[in-house]
A protein has these predicted regions:
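Glycine-rich phosphate-binding loop of nucleotide-binding enzymes
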Residues: 128-195
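Long, basic/Gly/Ser/Thr-rich N-terminal segments
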Residues: 1-120
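Extreme N-terminal, non-catalytic leader segments
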Residues: 114-115, 121-133
Length: 195
């Protein structure tokens, strides 16, 4: 089912055009399972009719003395990545990598809406394959355009044990399904792809 989100709000207190800082209250009932502000999550900031999309890269408490029985002011640092636009009410929202109007002081920020998150990750027309689902919203598929992926260099990187070999195997299987004409050569000195 669809994840029910806490729609608590925060407010922009700083913005330089690339990044913004949002001030919010972390309630005393917040726990790890319902944590609303989390690194790696997308949020949205209302600016007129559009919603700026930001990626949370850091969260810090204003007061380092944390008491689980009290509310705390937290600062959420976000990188501005684009905006959600909707030209007409009857049309679905879409994501644009540009930003027409930047957040002002006091602009309202909240967890991104389901439809907006889907718009950010919407598949373009092309040779699309589903490789999983989004960590932020499992009901939204994670997709790639095989032709775009193969038209440029790409790498799968990560630390030991995070699943690089599994990811490469999945990618190769999906690519070959869509493009059976493609030739694949794997140099495997550590015998990770023997099966």
């Amino acid at each position: 089912g669809q994840f029910k989100r806490n729609r608590s709000e925060g407010y922009v207190i700083e913005c330089d055009g690339n990044r913004a800082i949002i001030s919010a209250i972390s309630g005393k009932s917040s726990g790890a399972s319902d944590d609303y502000w989390a690194v790696g999550q997308l949020i949205s900031i209302r600016v007129g009719e559009n919603r700026i999309v930001g990626l949370i890269y850091e969260i810090k408490a204003e007061d380092p003395n944390w008491n689980p029985n009290e509310d705390h002011v937290v600062h959420i640092l976000v990188e501005l990545t684009g905006e959600i636009r909707q030209d007409k009410p009857e049309q679905p929202p879409y994501f644009s990598g540009g930003i027409k109007a930047y957040p002002y002081m006091g602009a309202v920020a909240h967890r991104i809406r389901h439809a907006d998150l889907a718009a950010v990750y919407a598949a373009s027309e092309g040779n699309i394959v589903t490789i999983g689902s989004l960590a932020q919203e499992a009901s939204i598929p994670a997709v790639i355009d095989v032709d775009k992926l193969l038209s440029r260099h790409f790498a799968v990187v990560g630390t030991t044990g995070v699943g690089k070999s599994t990811a490469v195997t999945l990618l190769l299987r999906k690519i070959v399904e869509k493009r059976p004409d493609i030739r694949v050569l794997i140099l495997d000195p550590h015998n990770e792809f023997s099966s």
